[in-house]
Design a protein with these regions (language model features):
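Residue-level recognition of tetratricopeptide repeat
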Residues: 27, 41-44, 158
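Post-signal peptide N-terminal segment of secreted/secretory-pathway proteins
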Residues: 44-137
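Sec-dependent N-terminal signal peptides
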Residues: 2-10
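Conserved small-residue packing positions in alpha-helical repeats and bundles
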Residues: 18-22, 35, 59, 66-69, ...
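Bacterial Sec signal peptide processing site at the extreme N-terminus
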Residues: 9-33
């Protein structure tokens, strides 16, 4: 008797209905979950209906974050903005790679914006690194090294960042 109860519970758990995508709080992950569902079942009506709403919510939330970060003067704002733009670009990529998803959502491509933002960030990190490099002391040299490294990571081969890293080291 216990065996049948346990078996019934397992069967019910494995046959659960589609998640209500719109009731979940993490729009970014929920959007990717809906796309994953569409990869398996391209006619899943729950995912197809939720996807445009999820994309709009996630896109708007990330753009609000970007707007908020852009008013900051801290160097870390670049990392936060790049992360948010990377998220919406990943959404774009996931949607255009899925026929069912791309039929119900026309996502925005942020690739050029992300490229430009990385160049702006690299310039800011490079400038800050130069300021630290011109100061005496090991701690400032370390900070200069880290900022030159960051500039080169954002834009590989950025100006003479690698040479300056050697100089700071």
């Amino acid at each position: 008797y216990i065996f049948y109860s346990f078996l019934s519970l397992i069967i019910l758990a494995s046959c659960k209905t589609n998640k209500d995508y719109l009731s979940r709080s993490d729009n970014d992950n929920t959007l990717f979950d809906a796309i994953k569902t569409l990869k398996k079942h391209n006619t899943d009506t729950t995912a197809l209906q939720a996807l445009p709403v999820l994309y709009n919510l996630a896109q708007q939330r990330n753009l609000r974050k970007i707007n908020s970060y852009s008013s900051s003067r801290e160097l870390s704002r670049w990392d936060k903005m790049i992360n948010a733009y990377s998220t919406v670009q990943e959404m774009y990529n996931a949607i255009v790679e899925n026929d069912a998803a791309s039929r119900v959502v026309t996502p925005v491509n942020y690739q050029q914006t992300l490229y430009d933002l990385k160049h702006e960030a690299a310039a800011d990190y490079y400038t800050a690194a130069t300021v630290f490099l011109n100061k005496p002391g090991r701690a400032d040299a370390k900070q200069a090294y880290n900022y030159f490294k960051k500039a080169d990571k954002l834009v590989p081969g950025y100006e003479d960042a690698k040479l300056k890293m050697d100089e700071a080291y």
